[in-house]
């Protein structure tokens, strides 16, 4: 093991890099395996139109099974610094990046079970840690730093909260998702996201599902989630239909809109008049 710059011990394994605190490592493997609620996988995104998505779903019937919950509505409340440091760093495509969010399935109320998630990406491998609690408990934990059960995951979340000063709700995202998993390998999953909405006001999972659309109605964001290789039938479909991976990020797309609007508000129009005594001088300003 070796200590990395984020304060965690890293363990090289066949599947890649796992990250744990030095204190937790001393507790031994049995505790490590029993307590963790960690997802480790590669996530590959593709932008499809509705026709392509339906063609793929039809072909998937032979190899995959629809999730028993069917179409679900996912709400994610992303936390960031006042100057959006986390998403700005993420958009620079660093070797390591992380996001902190609060997730619910549908609109929550104070007693709804929600998930505090710390999503990390290291060398293209995604590590997601999450803990379940009520929406009220999550709000008091993330905003007011009230104590919760001490686990490896909460320590990593605490480290994130301490490392990035003044983290608070920044963007609310919601979308409808269809999920499928392979019949012979439940770790291979495909999801289809539509009706992706965002807002940077009313920042609560309890406020409802509304906001501005990120994608055209004809577009579908597909994510392939796997701990191994993509099956050949899937590779053939993508090749035949000229579908290529994309680095599309819901949060980053919303942030670009926020940033562009802030720039327009802080920038004078391209041409404006400056009055200097009896003279009128036209200025051409480029933002």
Question: Which residue ranges define each predicted feature?
Answer:
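Extreme N-terminal basic, low-complexity initiation segments
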Residues: 2-9
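Phosphate-end processing signature that detects enzymes handling 5′-triphosphorylated RNA
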Residues: 6, 15, 19-287
